[in-house]
Every structure is written in C-alpha cells, then in structure tokens.
C-alpha cells in the first residue's frame, strides 16, 4: 500500500543515501552564535535605549557580527510581538515594503519597531495592534527617518 516495508516503517532499515541530512542541507552555512542584546526598543513610539547589561542570546545566523537583539517594550505590536520579547535584528539601512524594522525617527532619535510600508512618496510605520494608529512620514520628514535594521525573528522569554 505505501510501497515500503514494515522494517522501514518501524525504523529498522534505512537505505544508505548520498543526500545530506536536512540540517546540513538547509543550515550548513549557519552557525549557532551568541548575539549581544544591546538594549530596548519601544513597540510604541519612544526612545531606543542602548545599555550594556542585557547579556547575550543564541541565534542561528550566517554572519553573527551583523546581528543584535533588542528587548521589545510596549504593546503596539501585539498580539504577534509581546512586551518583553526579544527581537533579532539584522543591521541594514534599507527595508523592503512590508518588512518589520527598527526605525529611528525625529531629531531626538525616537526609536520604534514597526512594519515598514511605502505608499507613493511617504512611509507608513504600521503597528499590528489596531488600538494604535499608523504614523505617516512624508516630505522633508523622511530625511529624519533612519533604518537601524530588519527584524528577522522574535522570541518570547518566559
């Protein structure tokens, strides 16, 4: 019925193959590395705080020097990202439409974690939580918007 033997289904027989293990095939160039947790970022709109005492957290990445973690504060990205979650950020200065990013805006360096949307000649910083409003940045104000990186993963700490 299944074109196999009972021994194979019971794990008693496994044919030898030249196919690499799934982990090698898909994650071979990635390494488990300690990535620094460099501070906090508001899920709302507020300050990006850099502090030294947050420690490190493991992540499976290709180029660990180009990543950092931030502790998320606030509830504007709920229900998907909670207060206290860790956001793994890839350092880069551009984002694709729809990416989650850590963005710094304004003269005082206000930092936030939001979905990045380009609409015509403006950028929309979009929260997941419908209780919060989008922030639309246009014109001259776009000169005050800086991208710190793209959020590639979040994880909850219990």
Model-derived segments and their meaning:
Residues 7-83, 96-97, 107-111, 118, ...:
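Short, positionally conserved secondary-structure boundary motifs
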Residues 1:
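Short, basic-rich loop-to-helix N-cap that marks the start of a DNA-contacting helix
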Residues 125-127:
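SH3/SH3-like beta-barrel fold
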Residues 130-141:
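Low-complexity, intrinsically disordered Gly/Pro/Thr-rich segments
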Residues 86, 113-115, 136:
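Well-ordered beta-strand positions in beta-sheet-rich domains
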């Amino acid at each position: 019925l299944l074109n196999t033997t009972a021994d194979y289904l019971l794990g008693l027989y496994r044919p030898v193959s030249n196919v690499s293990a799934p982990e090698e095939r898909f994650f071979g160039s990635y390494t488990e590395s300690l990535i620094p947790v460099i501070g906090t970022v508001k899920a709302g709109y507020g300050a990006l705080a850099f502090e030294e005492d947050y420690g490190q957290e493991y992540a499976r990445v290709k180029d660990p020097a180009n990543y950092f973690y931030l502790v998320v504060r606030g509830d504007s990205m709920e229900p998907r990202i909670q207060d206290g979650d860790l956001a793994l950020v890839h350092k880069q200065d551009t984002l694709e439409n729809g990416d989650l990013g850590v963005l710094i805006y304004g003269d005082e360096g206000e930092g936030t974690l939001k979905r990045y949307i380009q609409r015509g000649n403006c950028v929309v910083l979009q929260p997941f939580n419908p209780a919060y409003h989008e922030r639309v940045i246009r014109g001259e104000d776009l000169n005050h918007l800086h991208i710190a990186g793209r959020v590639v993963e979040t994880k909850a700490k219990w």
